[in-house]
Amino acid sequence: MTTRTLRFYALVGFLVFLDQVTKYLAHAYLARDFIVIPNLFRLTLAKNSGAAFSFGTGFSWLFFLLGIIALIFIGWFLPRTTGSIVFLALLQGGIAGNVFDRLFKPPYFGNGEVVDFLNTPLLSGVVFNIADLFILAGVFGTFLFLKGSK
């Protein structure tokens, strides 16, 4: 395994750890909404069986399967790319964090619900988590990187 690959998986591991710690803290301490910035940002505990930003609620098993496929694809793609691994690590870490929830959170094994807790009225009541932000940053960054390399 190359140093680059080790760095990639170390970053992915750190991102998954960060995601799981924030979800644990939200689940343990958010009994009710906590307003961080009035009318702009609050912490709201929610369970989500859909994808990022509550899209596709009720299809947890499908997003679990798509997550596994994406993790395998990124793992396959990593050695074939010469670009920055940061965006791929953000993508991999975010997907892995949410796949972990679907696997190990009730009702378990592919049907689990993802813990969401970040809420802003700017997104019309959508509640999301750190992993969703990692995924969004990874997709956006990868797109910009690929566009810039052409």
From Swiss-Prot:
Domain of life: Bacteria
Active site per database record: D116, D132
Record Pfam families: Peptidase_A8
Listed EC numbers: 3.4.23.36
Transmembrane segments: 8-28, 58-78, 81-101, 126-146
Gene Ontology biological process: proteolysis
GO molecular function: aspartic-type endopeptidase activity
Family: Belongs to the peptidase A8 family.
The name this protein goes by in its record: Lipoprotein signal peptidase
Provenance organism: Tropheryma whipplei (strain Twist)
Lineage of the species this protein comes from: Bacteria, Bacillati, Actinomycetota, Actinomycetes, Micrococcales
Gene: lspA
